[in-house]
């Protein structure tokens, strides 16, 4: 990683340092908490890093996918919804990637859901970062309960976030607490008493 610590190490070793004055938006997103905050800032009415400025150009070729579909009885507020996403539930104060499906009865709050993920019926997801190609079963509650430090990596999995790694499968009818990280295909047996 390249951060401020690297600058100090180079200075101590007497290595040459160079500086560049930059007046644009910059935010250190080296932790899950700061990454989550940076995404939530994009939802502000006029974000500091304003993606809607006239001088922003599109330099990458986008996927050829249909526009977003928001069902008639769906609710979306203060959120960014990418192309190809289908919303049948509720999305509040969240950033949703391309090709995501949010099924009927699901409620998403203060979360980041990356592309091609599927959120099941009647799921409640609070303050989560969900990576690409994740499948969440029906009736899952995520980000629930008291904020308890993560047992394995309390300095990494903190900030009250639930973190779900790419290609993860979460079975239906489970509850996932705050500061939890899930990776890989899981089954009901991985959730003692239906809770993690």
Spans of features found by a protein language model:
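Left-handed beta-helix
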Residues: 2-196
């Amino acid at each position: 990683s390249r951060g401020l610590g690297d600058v100090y190490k180079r200075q101590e070793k007497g290595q040459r340092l160079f500086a560049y004055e930059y007046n644009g938006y910059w935010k250190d997103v080296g932790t899950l908490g700061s990454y989550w905050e940076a995404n939530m800032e994009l939802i502000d009415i006029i974000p500091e890093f304003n993606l809607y400025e006239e001088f922003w150009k599109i330099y990458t070729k986008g996927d050829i996918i249909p526009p977003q579909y928001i069902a008639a009885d769906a609710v979306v507020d203060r959120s960014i919804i990418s192309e190809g996403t289908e919303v049948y539930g509720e999305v509040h104060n969240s950033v949703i990637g391309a090709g995501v499906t949010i099924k009927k009865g699901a409620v998403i709050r203060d979360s980041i859901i990356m592309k091609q993920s599927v959120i099941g019926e009647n799921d409640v997801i609070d303050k989560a970062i969900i990576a690409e190609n994740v499948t969440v079963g029906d009736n899952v509650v995520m980000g629930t309960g008291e904020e308890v430090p993560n047992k394995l990596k309390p300095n990494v999995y903190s900030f009250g976030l639930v973190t779900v790694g790419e290609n993860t499968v979460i079975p239906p009818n489970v509850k996932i607490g705050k500061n939890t990280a899930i990776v890989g295909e899981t089954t009901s047996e991985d959730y003692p008493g239906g809770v993690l």
